[in-house]
A protein has these predicted regions:
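Carbohydrate-binding surface patches
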Residues: 1-42, 76-80, 110-111, 151
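Acidic, Ser/Thr/Pro-rich beta/coil linker or hinge segments at domain junctions
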Residues: 26-74
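Short strand-edge motifs at loop-to-beta-strand transitions and within beta-strands
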Residues: 67-69, 79, 131-133
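Extracellular Ig-like/FN3 beta-sandwich strand-entry sites
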Residues: 78, 113, 139-141
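Pro/Thr/Ser/Gly-rich low-complexity, intrinsically disordered linker/stalk tracts
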Residues: 85-111, 149-155
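Solvent-exposed loop/turn segments flanking beta-strands in beta-repeat/beta-sandwich domains
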Residues: 108-121
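Short beta-strand segments within Ig-like beta-sandwich modules, predominantly Fibronectin type-III
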Residues: 123-130
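Beta-strand-rich modules
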Residues: 134-153
């Protein structure tokens, strides 16, 4: 079982303390916060945009101590907290090959694979669910990384 909550702050930056001492799973009564909450922040003044519409990276975790946790909320923001994640590195993508202006690779067999991020010379150039990409013959050092459902990026 997992816990996910959204904290919306419509005013100036502040810190809030949340009492989670009574949160229990529905089945066996054990505390719901079995691991730290992953923290993702969306700020109105600084929207998380990138050219490829990738999910934004988490901005750390929050751990409950003594049945409470404290979270800093930026001004005019939404902070999303969840235990629904696995912190891991997806498997490396193999078979990356550039031939005739087309970059191709072997499909990921990772259990929670969602899409790929493609890099040329260390700079992201695309996000795709496909296993090939027309790069118009652009030379460079290419890398393809698997991204899983928890937004973990492979090596």
């Amino acid at each position: 079982r997992s816990v996910s909550i959204a904290l919306i702050n419509r005013g100036p930056a502040k810190t809030v303390t949340v009492d989670c001492s009574t949160w229990r799973t529905r089945t066996d009564g054990t505390p719901s916060l079995h691991q730290p909450l992953r923290r993702i922040v969306y700020e109105a003044a600084n929207p998380p945009l990138n050219a490829f519409n990738d999910l934004q990276a988490a901005s750390g975790t929050v751990t409950a101590t003594g049945g409470v946790f404290t979270v800093a909320l930026p001004a005019k923001s939404m902070t999303f907290l969840t235990t629904d994640y696995i912190d891991r590195t997806p498997p490396a993508v193999g078979g990356v090959e550039l031939k005739g202006g087309v970059l191709s690779w072997t499909a990921s067999t990772g259990p929670a694979h969602v899409y790929y991020r493609v890099y040329r010379d260390g700079v992201q150039i695309a996000s795709t669910v496909a296993t090939r990409l027309d790069v118009k013959g652009a030379k460079g050092d290419y890398a393809v990384r698997s991204v899983d459902r928890w937004n973990n990026v492979g090596r």
